[in-house]
Amino acid sequence: FPNVQMLPLDLRELFRDTPLADWYTAVQGRWEPYLLPVLSDASRIALMWKFGGIYLDTDFIVLKNLRNLTNVLGTQSRYVLNGAFLAFQRRHEFMALCMRDFVDHYNGWIWGHQGPQLLTRVFKKWCSIRSLAESRACRGVTTLPPEAFYPIPWQDWKKYFEDISPEELPRLLNATYAVHVWNKKSQGTRFEATSRALLAQLHARYCPTTHEAMKMYL
């Protein structure tokens, strides 16, 4: 694909001139149970701050054009946001607050504390609310409902491997921009690429090149 580039990620350079620089220096050589996902959490907010644009985890299947989404993040459940999808303008103050919160309230020993919980904390402060139910948007930042990016909760990840009729597929995902398939849970699960499993049909319809490659190994 001529419009796809693979670039190395220099974390020290990425975090330079941000609140994350000193934290990254301090964490070098220190063992923490979730350091890799924590580094991922730090990287995405730094990328959003420095460059803006759209960030997606690699376990997403995109269904619709995302270009009209700006200063948007997705709601995972009624209680928490998720940073697997982010769309922000360059140097947006919300991302600056995320970086500061990352350092000020750092705890690398709790799963999600530096990721979904951080975004939830910052959004509540941003909007001066106690519950996500109080506001979907304020001060130029919008949270979309779970069906936008997380139509199937992580607790129900096995549904991606269950059969579904082709007619039911568009109804299920009518309000969905992109589907997060919860690779942390689903990795290693086998399915037939040509089956009627929901994930197989998503690949066939929205990832035709990948789907053809998958069929070579049947």
From Swiss-Prot:
InterPro entries: A1-4-GlycosylTfrase_dom, Glycosyltransf_32, GlycoTrfase_DXD_sugar-bd_CS, Nucleotide-diphossugar_trans. It catalyses: a beta-D-Gal-(1->4)-beta-D-Glc-(1<->1)-Cer(d18:1(4E)) + UDP-alpha-D-galactose = a globoside Gb3Cer (d18:1(4E)) + UDP + H(+); a beta-D-Gal-(1<->1')-ceramide + UDP-alpha-D-galactose = alpha-D-Gal-(1->4)-beta-D-Gal-(1<->1')-Cer + UDP + H(+). Its EC number is 2.4.1.228. One of its GO terms (molecular function) is lactosylceramide 4-alpha-galactosyltransferase activity. Belongs to the glycosyltransferase 32 family. PANTHER family: LACTOSYLCERAMIDE 4-ALPHA-GALACTOSYLTRANSFERASE, LACTOSYLCERAMIDE 4-ALPHA-GALACTOSYLTRANSFERASE ALPHA- 1,4-GALACTOSYLTRANSFERASE. The conserved DXD motif is involved in enzyme activity. This is Lactosylceramide 4-alpha-galactosyltransferase. It comes from Pongo pygmaeus. The gene is A4GALT.
